[in-house]
């Protein structure tokens, strides 16, 4: 049987052993017991007091001890063995090598990394495998956070609301469709706003007061023609009782006239042109003979005779000439 001992000694921790004696060279003999010396046997001689000798021995501290015993049947461990290691995932085998293993987060079980001769190599294998798992976990997390940009954006259905509006003649029930903007990925609100503004500039609309008087209108690209409803206009005039407007009858048709002079007749159908300046100027030339007979002080507009040709397609002056209609309505 072959046995060997492995010891680990810490030189920083030293124990001191003190050895105390009277004669470090003393031996066991009969002469040491003799207390009488000389010719006179009765004379006693006092022995000298013994000296005290102190000897110190310094011994280092033993931290751990391994004792292995080998025989024909195999190796058996004798004493306590340390199987754990200072590195995570590394364990020491009974025969002195180090095993490394790591937990697989995807399969929920341990993965064997192998056996290494040194503790550092086993720890390095553990860290390498841990980095691989961390990279795979990061990629999986990024895939979950990705959004599919190829899918169309969702658009809510428009909501309809009934609104009752009061006008000068009658109550109008309108169904208003609330515009819902699209939402989701890839939607830009700036482009939507620019499209709405450009559409408003391309399609001119009448004011609400003119639309209520003359009814629905057909909107064209360049001109807006308003169909004149004589019966509805007569009812409005009768309700407000204008002093300078009266109803005249010529044959079976009903026309409008003004109390200025003996005779003044206005055609039954009037056309209002808002965007074509040339047509409006031609209409004014047709009315010049009638305007000469009118007393302009009866009208709230003083610049009717001062109207000229439009410059640079600016028709803002036309809005001023129709303000008297809104005023009396």
Swiss-Prot record:
The keyword Transcription regulation applies. GO terms for molecular function: DNA binding; DNA-binding transcription factor activity. InterPro entries: AP2/ERF_dom, AP2/ERF_dom_sf, AP2/ERF_ERF_subfamily, DNA-bd_dom_sf. Residues 71-86 have a biased composition (Polar residues). Residues 86-143 bind DNA. GO terms for biological process: ethylene-activated signaling pathway. Residues 25-51, 71-90 are annotated as: Disordered. Belongs to the AP2/ERF transcription factor family. ERF subfamily. Probably acts as a transcriptional activator. Binds to the GCC-box pathogenesis-related promoter element. May be involved in the regulation of gene expression by stress factors and by components of stress signal transduction pathways. This is Ethylene-responsive transcription factor ERF117. The gene is ERF117.
């Amino acid at each position: 049987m072959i046995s060997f001992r492995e010891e680990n000694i810490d030189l920083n921790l030293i124990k001191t052993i003190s050895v105390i004696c009277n004669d470090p060279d003393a031996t066991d003999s009969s002469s040491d017991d003799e207390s009488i010396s000389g010719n006179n046997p009765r004379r006693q001689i006092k022995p000298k007091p013994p000296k005290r000798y102190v000897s110190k021995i310094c011994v280092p501290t033993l931290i751990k001890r391994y004792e292995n015993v080998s025989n024909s049947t195999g190796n058996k461990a004798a004493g306590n063995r340390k199987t754990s290691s200072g590195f995570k995932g590394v364990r020491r085998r009974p025969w002195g090598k180090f095993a490394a293993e790591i937990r697989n987060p995807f399969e929920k079980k341990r993965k064997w990394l192998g056996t290494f001769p040194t503790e550092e190599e086993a720890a390095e294998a553990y860290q390498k495998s841990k980095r691989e798992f961390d990279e795979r976990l990061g990629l999986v997390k990024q895939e979950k956070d990705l959004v599919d940009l190829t899918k169309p954006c969702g658009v809510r259905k428009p909501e309809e609301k009934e609104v009752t509006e009061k006008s000068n003649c009658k109550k109008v029930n309108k169904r208003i469709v609330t515009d819902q903007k699209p939402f989701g990925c890839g939607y830009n609100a700036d482009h939507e706003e620019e499209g709405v503004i450009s559409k408003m500039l391309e399609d001119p609309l009448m004011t609400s007061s003119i639309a209520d008087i003359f009814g629905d209108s057909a909107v064209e690209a360049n001109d807006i023609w308003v169909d004149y409803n004589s019966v509805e206009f007569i009812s409005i005039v009768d309700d407000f009782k204008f002093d300078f407007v009266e109803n005249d009858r010529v044959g079976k048709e009903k026309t409008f006239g003004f109390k200025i002079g003996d005779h003044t007749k206005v055609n039954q159908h009037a056309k209002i042109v808002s965007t074509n300046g040339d047509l409006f100027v031609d209409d004014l030339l047709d009315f010049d003979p009638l305007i000469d007979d009118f007393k302009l002080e009866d009208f709230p507009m003083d610049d009717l005779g001062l109207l000229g040709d439009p410059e640079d397609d600016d028709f803002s002056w036309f809005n001023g000439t129709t303000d008297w209609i809104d005023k009396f309505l």
